[in-house]
Amino acid sequence: MRIGTVAGSVWATKKCPGLRGQPLLLVRMDGKLIVAADLVGAGVGERVLLSFGSAARLEVPDAPADAAIVGIVDPMEEERHVDQ
C-alpha cells in the first residue's frame, strides 16, 4: 500500500459496466496524479491508503481498476530515530 492525498474528483459520463456507480478520485502521490476507485468515501484534501494492481482488483472485481482507495489515514506522526 501507498499513501496519497485526494486532489479532486474524476467524472466519466461513459465507462465500462464494472465502473458504473463507482466514484473515481484524482490522487496526488509522489508528485504525480493518478486516478483511483474510491471504496471508502474519501474527500478532497484527505490522506488515503491506496492498493495497486491485483490487490486493487480484489476490491473492485468487475472493473479494470489499477488503483483503489482502501482507507483514510488519520493524522499521524513519523517516528524519528536519533543516532548516538
Predicted regions and their residues:
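N-terminal first-folded block
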Residues: 1-27
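Generic structural signal for buried aliphatic residues
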Residues: 11, 48-49
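Short beta-strand-to-turn element immediately C-terminal to the catalytic PLP-Schiff-base lysine
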Residues: 27-29, 51
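Short alpha-helix capping/helix-loop boundary micro-motifs
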Residues: 32-37
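C-terminal structural segments of small proteins and small subunits
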Residues: 51, 55-84
